[in-house]
Amino acid sequence: MRKKIVVGNWKMNKTVTESLVLAAEVTAALGEGFTGCDVGIAPPFTALYEVGKLTGSRLALVAQNCHFEPDGAFTGEVSASMVREAGCSAVIAGHSERRHCFGETNAIVNRKVKHALSEGLQVIMCAGETLEQREGGVTGDVVTAQVREGLLGIDDISNIVIAYEPVWAIGTGKTATSEQAEEVHLLIRNTVSDLFGEEAAGRLRIQYGGSVKPSNAKELFSMPNIDGGLIGGASLNAADFVAIVKAAV
């Protein structure tokens, strides 16, 4: 039985002070000793250290991104070792906004995954198709390529989580049904099985990241290949986020 994992991605929201308030609200609402599923939050870089001091081991601290080089002349970038030292145990790689706003390719995502793993971080690697790709009938090709190329040259996926983000269902007014999400999650698991074997694929946790809300979380998380969520907007409200977390139990 795969343990569900729910991570709140705060994106470019919340000052340090606001982040501390939200983190405190989440930990208080979850209560002491919550073990029903793995829970993490990904505040902005500026708040990581302070939030980590506040939450301790009660919540996994996740970085929203990192560079693929350990150091050097890369103005504005942050390395995996830097976020690890700030208290992070995990990092997101290849989020759809990084791909579409900043031009990150599958090859770049692959380098980030490898570097983060080498620093001992868990990696949440994202994959997903756009509305144009969905309507063009190439969802399978796009997602399979993202998974295959993102995991190229990696031997051990035990510290990897994959998050499926149907970009076409985020902010477009279109909604992915639980069946549509499950179909792609199964495709991802089968792709990983082809690469790493059935046993490794069976252990892999695959999150769903397409506008999860308290109202649809339970149904999504009941699907056999959906192992939790990578939560965007709803994670900025403690009550909504905790409701989603508890739907995973």
From Swiss-Prot:
The keyword DNA damage does not apply. It is an enzyme of class 5 (isomerase). Substrate binds at N9, W10, K11, G171, S211, G232, G233. InterPro entries: Aldolase_TIM, TIM_sf, TrioseP_Isoase_bac/euk, Triosephosphate_isomerase, Triosephosphate_isomerase_AS. Its main location: cytoplasm. One of its GO terms (biological process) is glycolytic process. Pathway: Carbohydrate biosynthesis; gluconeogenesis; Carbohydrate degradation; glycolysis; D-glyceraldehyde 3-phosphate from glycerone phosphate: step 1/1. Disulfide bonds: none annotated. GO terms for molecular function: triose-phosphate isomerase activity. Gene3D superfamilies: Aldolase class I. The keyword Membrane does not apply. Its EC number is 5.3.1.1. The active site is at H95, E165. Belongs to the triosephosphate isomerase family. Homodimer. Involved in the gluconeogenesis. Catalyzes stereospecifically the conversion of dihydroxyacetone phosphate (DHAP) to D-glyceraldehyde-3-phosphate (G3P). This is Triosephosphate isomerase. The gene is tpiA.
